Amino acid sequence: MAGAAPTTAFGQAVIGPPGSGKTTYCLGMSEFLRALGRRVAVVNLDPANEGLPYECAVDVGELVGLGDVMDALRLGPNGGLLYCMEYLEANLDWLRAKLEPLRGHYFLFDCPGQVELCTHHTSLRSIFSQMAQWDLRLTAVHLVDSHYCTDPAKFISVLCTSLATMLHVELPHVNLLSKMDLIEHYGKLAFNLDYYTEVLDLSYLLDHLASDPFFSHYRQLNEKLVQLIEDYSLVSFIPLNIQDKDSIQRVLQAVDKANGYCFGVQEQRSLEALMSAAVGADFHFSSTLGIQEKYLASSDQTAEQEAMQL
């Protein structure tokens, strides 16, 4: 029937550690999508989120409150949040009843920031799996603060966390380096930006760590971690400045390709636009180079000097 609501829905599960910019991303992405003409519903799955800057279509706080759980069960913030997710998992009928009237919208799920929820705890994964049974196609959008690139040890840690998340969540996955406009506020990058976004030869990071007296004692451990990351060869990043429309568009292009939205029937596209969405997301070098020129200070001389020191 022409007036029937579409059976398949699409959306993004926005995940990442605390402070990575998930809520700000949901606000910026929702505004961008509405400007494109998409009907958007933002769903807050974080019971600790207060003072939300966006219009919330569904709020898990209506089902269970973190403060109430902490008081009643004498749990801390982390334990209370895990309980809230387990409670939501046990009451998915409530969530489905809230989402069903929004069928035909594009969903943005603002998820909690506790890392363990995406690396080894099962509740969030089970919730996403159940959504797939409701014919809701999600892409996991994993945000990581870009300033971690300025510290080789932290960047290796980020790579391990990103890999563990990709393997555990079991969704089409897009990793983002958020807050690109602030990337060098904590220090200069040792290499060009594409080294970090494409996760190139990580042995160079090991050489940088070896120059640090503290990390030199853990070289074998770091070598094994790097080997694990390179053996899987799954992790890469897209740089994002949520204030930059071109940057948001590149992210959306990758997300649409990952969950199949660009090939759906909800949004009419010309053949040229379809091919652009299908192929263009695979080639990030030119866009990454543009972002580097925009947000990073010229460092050719510094790079040469550091290369001489290796």
Swiss-Prot record:
Site (Stabilizes the phosphate intermediate): 78
Keyword Hydrolase: yes
InterPro entries given in the database record: Gpn, Gpn2, P-loop_NTPase
A single MF term (Gene Ontology): GTPase activity
Entry keyword Nucleotide-binding: yes
Positions of GTP binding: 19-24, 178-181
UniProt motif (Gly-Pro-Asn (GPN)-loop) ranges: 76-78
Biological role: Small GTPase required for proper localization of RNA polymerase II and III (RNAPII and RNAPIII). May act at an RNAP assembly step prior to nuclear import.
Protein name (Swiss-Prot/TrEMBL): GPN-loop GTPase 2
Organism listed in the record: Rattus norvegicus (Rat)
Originating gene: Gpn2
